[in-house]
């Protein structure tokens, strides 16, 4: 019987994981170091592993699945089931070259991440950090200033996937006009009443810009000094996707100059380190990457990973294969 290797922990769907013992030998690497994991691989402890369940905490144990790690993975490995919508810590091209299929957890994260995006957007528009911190310091309103209403504002969404569309649905309830830019225009059914615009037009005409796209080599620092210069004065920036989509030093400069009115961020370029200029700026709403941290979403993510794993073993294909491999496996 082939094996499945769990890296990290399963918290909410432990029973479903254990039920897979009818079709797989279950092996676990619950904690340890990258060196421990590499040594285990080299010693042949995982030589019959067909599929890996990569939990959303696994990176702190093994580090990224880069070329070094891929080189020592067992030759029996055919599938990596990753728990997370973002998978920039997996060398997908390297996996493809080795014949390893990779899945992620889109859809399951859409609602929770969009909720946090709206929370950050409203918080940034109202510059809510100032009164929140003043109240806790016993200063009542402190240096609170007038905020901005969302009604009538243009929300520009960069990356109109599942999370972006849920963000749009919620923003429309606030009376916002929605425009977006994607690599390609959506179908009329998915687009709804949102307007498709060029990247430059999105930058130039949005009152709020929400980043909802994947991080890869072509999108790293997609928002930097040059892009800030093209934006409206007083724009609000929201990022719940990946921190490195934005050049954080350029964002700090844009905030200091007033080009950017405020920002709401859940992700950072060098997590868990946050650019000090962002920490020190009272115009910025900061959260510590909690976009999917609800009980319901975490359970749904774990179940989707397990469904991918079962499908891989029983059908030879996964449900939510990463887009880069759609025409490969």
Swiss-Prot record:
Claim: Protease is one of the keywords in the record: no
Pfam families noted in UniProt: 2-Hacid_dh (PF00389), 2-Hacid_dh_C (PF02826)
Reaction catalyzed: (2R)-hydroxy-4-methylpentanoate + NADP(+) = 4-methyl-2-oxopentanoate + NADPH + H(+); a (2R)-2-hydroxycarboxylate + NADP(+) = a 2-oxocarboxylate + NADPH + H(+)
Gene Ontology molecular functions: glyoxylate reductase (NADPH) activity; hydroxypyruvate reductase [NAD(P)H] activity; NAD binding
Residues binding NAD(+): 162-163, 240-242, 266
pH dependence: Optimum pH is 4.5 to 6.0.
InterPro entries the record matches: D-isomer_2-hydroxyacid_DH, D-isomer_2_OHA_DH_cat_dom, D-isomer_DH_CS, D-isomer_DH_CS1, D-isomer_DH_NAD-bd, NAD(P)-bd_dom_sf
GO cellular component annotations of the record: cytosol
Induction per the UniProt record: Leucine and 4-methyl-2-oxopentanate (MOA) increase the expression 3.1- and 4.5-fold, respectively, whereas leucate represses the expression.
Keywords recorded for this protein, A-Z: NAD, Oxidoreductase
Application notes: Ethyl-2-hydroxy-4-methylpentanoate (ethyl leucate) contributes to a fruity flavor in Japanese sake and the strain overexpressing morA would help to ferment high-quality sake with an excellent flavor.
Enzyme class: oxidoreductase
Active-site residues, Swiss-Prot/TrEMBL: 242, 271, 289 (proton donor)
Family matches, as CDD domains: Mand_dh_like
Superkingdom of origin: Eukaryota
Enzyme Commission (EC) number: 1.1.1.272
Family affiliation: Belongs to the D-isomer specific 2-hydroxyacid dehydrogenase family.
Biological function: 4-methyl-2-oxopentanoate (MOA) reductase that reduces MOA, a possible intermediate in leucine synthesis, to D-leucate in a NADPH- or NADH-dependent manner, but with a preference for NADPH. In addition to MOA, shows broad substrate specificity toward 2-keto acids.
Protein name stated in the entry: 4-methyl-2-oxopentanoate reductase A
Organism for this UniProt entry: Aspergillus oryzae (strain ATCC 42149 / RIB 40) (Yellow koji mold)
